[in-house]
């Protein structure tokens, strides 16, 4: 299969490769260092061809199952975190040993959703990853499961890999798992499931039924599709391919499903506002303000706000909602929640001079379509 979108992945200089838990385990569920070594070999070939590669690797919890004498993946949070603590050591040591065969050094980068959502930590993570690449080390990124709470079910690193792809300015993202691409329904349950080789946008997914997670990983098809749409909307093409064909996927992108990127890449700040930052509150707008913000790309003024919810400070990211409560945009708010509550519905001329700035400036606004809102 050849297409301009596959060619973009085949020729990408900067690449993020996400390796799922099921790609690193045996059929019985035990961590398999041999499988990891095979994936490292495929990545090494791509790097020898001139690409810079960052690896987002799941598998810490699975790698901790056997050393702790567990018979299966734990279900309670404390045991998951204990398994991740033990397994992360084995995981990064395996990557280190695999790349040492090629004279390469690896660096471990553990992140949480909170790290990505906070602007300072977000920037520091970006600098660290950039520096590792400049020093020719292979960055191995994983979610820090030992301190994560709800994030431990973040999607088997699918969403994290999409965020990292934009964070490092990657030219493409490759999601490797135990599936060979996207189908209109689960091919394991439906004999006539139709393979979807290319997705140009969310509209192509109307009617597609995504499967649930595997027994070892936490990232089902819905998680992978959501991550792929996130990256593609931010300007990064994505290949969803089977880990068993990693060598082919990384060599010529001729397998799996490709998600076409939007023509213009989001700026780092707009991407952070749109996808990475945690919204700490919400503003409900009247219909006129929704039109101004979404269609005309204008700044939000206090007169168009009908309600304020949440506890936030100036500089935080908030959701902008239509009268029916549907999110229509996200943006950086200029005022504290308590201050803004006194401004609701008032025209600029009614406000004192220090409160006449836009509530959310157009430069700090990112509109969100109904389909996109489901990906946040």
Swiss-Prot record:
Chain sites annotated for binding ATP: 18, 177-178, 218-224
Keyword presence, Ribonucleoprotein: no
Source organism superkingdom: Bacteria
Annotated PUA domain residues: 280-358
Pathway(s): Amino-acid biosynthesis; L-proline biosynthesis; L-glutamate 5-semialdehyde from L-glutamate: step 1/2
Subcellular location: Cytoplasm
One annotated Gene Ontology cellular component of this protein: cytosol
UniProt keyword annotation of Ribosomal protein present: no
EC number: 2.7.2.11
Reactions catalysed: L-glutamate + ATP = L-glutamyl 5-phosphate + ADP
Pfam families: AA_kinase (PF00696), PUA (PF01472)
InterPro entries per UniProt: AceGlu_kinase-like_sf, Asp/Glu/Uridylate_kinase, G5K_ProB, Glu/AcGlu_kinase, Glu_5kinase, Glu_5kinase/COase_Synthase, Glutamate_5-kinase_CS, PUA
Family stated for the protein in its record: Belongs to the glutamate 5-kinase family.
Known function: Catalyzes the transfer of a phosphate group to glutamate to form L-glutamate 5-phosphate.
PANTHER family: GLUTAMATE 5-KINASE, ISOPENTENYL PHOSPHATE KINASE
Protein name per the record: Glutamate 5-kinase
Organism of provenance: Mycobacterium bovis (strain ATCC BAA-935 / AF2122/97)
Gene designation: proB
């Amino acid at each position: 299969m050849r297409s301009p979108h596959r060619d973009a992945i085949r020729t990408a200089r900067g690449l993020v490769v996400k390796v799922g838990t099921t790609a690193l385990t045996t059929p019985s569920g035990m961590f398999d260092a041999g499988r990891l070594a095979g994936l490292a070999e495929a990545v090494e070939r791509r790097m020898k061809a001139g690409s810079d590669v960052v690896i987002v690797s799941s598998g810490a919890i699975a790698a901790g199952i056997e050393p702790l004498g567990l018979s299966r993946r734990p279900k309670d949070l404390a045991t998951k975190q204990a398994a991740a603590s033990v397994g992360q050591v084995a995981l990064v040591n395996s990557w280190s040993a695999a790349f040492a065969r090629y004279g390469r050094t690896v660096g471990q980068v553990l992140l949480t959703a909170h790290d990505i959502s906070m602007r300072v930590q977000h920037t520091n993570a970006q600098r660290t990853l950039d520096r590792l690449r400049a020093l020719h080390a292979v960055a191995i990124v994983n979610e820090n499961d030992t301190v994560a709470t709800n994030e431990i079910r973040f999607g088997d690193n699918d969403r994290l890999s999409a965020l990292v792809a934009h964070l490092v300015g990657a030219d493409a993202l490759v999601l490797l798992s135990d599936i060979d691409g996207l189908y209109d329904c689960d091919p394991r349950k439906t004999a006539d499931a139709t393979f979807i080789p290319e997705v140009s946008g969310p509209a192509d997914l109307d009617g597609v039924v995504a499967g649930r997670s595997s027994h070892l990983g936490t990232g089902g098809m819905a998680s992978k599709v959501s991550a792929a749409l996130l990256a593609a909307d931010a300007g990064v093409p994505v290949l969803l391919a089977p880990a068993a064909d990693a060598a082919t996927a990384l060599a010529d992108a001729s397998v799996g499903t490709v998600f076409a990127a939007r023509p213009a890449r989001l700026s780092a700040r707009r991407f952070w506002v749109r996808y990475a930052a945690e919204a700490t509150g919400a503003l409900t707008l009247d219909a006129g303000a929704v039109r101004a913000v979404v269609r005309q790309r204008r700044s939000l003024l206090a007169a168009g706000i009908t309600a304020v919810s949440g506890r936030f400070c100036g500089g935080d990211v908030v959701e902008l909602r239509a009268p029916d409560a549907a999110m229509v945009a996200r943006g950086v708010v200029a005022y504290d929640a308590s201050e803004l509550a006194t401004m609701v519905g008032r025209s600029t001329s009614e406000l004192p001079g220090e409160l006449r700035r836009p509530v959310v400036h157009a430069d700090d606004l990112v509109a969100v379509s109904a389909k996109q809102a489901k990906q946040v």
